[in-house]
Amino acid sequence: MKFVRTILVIVVALCCMSFTVVIDAGHGGNDAGAIGHVLKLKEKDLNLCVAQRLANKIQEQYPEVNVVMTRTTDVFLQLQKRADIVNKNHADLFICIHTNAAENRKACGAETFILGTDRMEDNLDVAMRENAVMKLEQDQTVYQGFDPNSIE
């Protein structure tokens, strides 16, 4: 949380006007995400818990920041709907929470991905993994032919 606090302090200080953060709790509804080996915890539930706690922390410490959650309950949101929420609220910062799984049981800690405009292989791997949820959606025409399995 210290990292997020530092980012918010810098960004809010630089912005004289209102500032909006959209927090996206990844997965949800019929998309469970990763499931833990031992406790069988579902990623969607952990993501929602972390996202809600982060939103509360931001609101407590920075009441001038407008915090918007993409979901506050266990519902499935299409990727397009998540993007619509970000765009409709003119987000200055978009934070997407995921609690990824690892085959190595000794693995622990946090991952932070900041996807820029460079076409790095790691960015493509993350995008392909996270966009695979599109396969669960009924209407994929909103993506105008985007293939979640393609590296292009």
Predicted regions and their residues:
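Positively charged n-region of N-terminal signal peptides that target proteins for export
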Residues: 1-6
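Bacterial N-terminal signal peptides
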Residues: 7-16
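Catalytic-core regions of hydrolytic enzymes
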Residues: 19-149
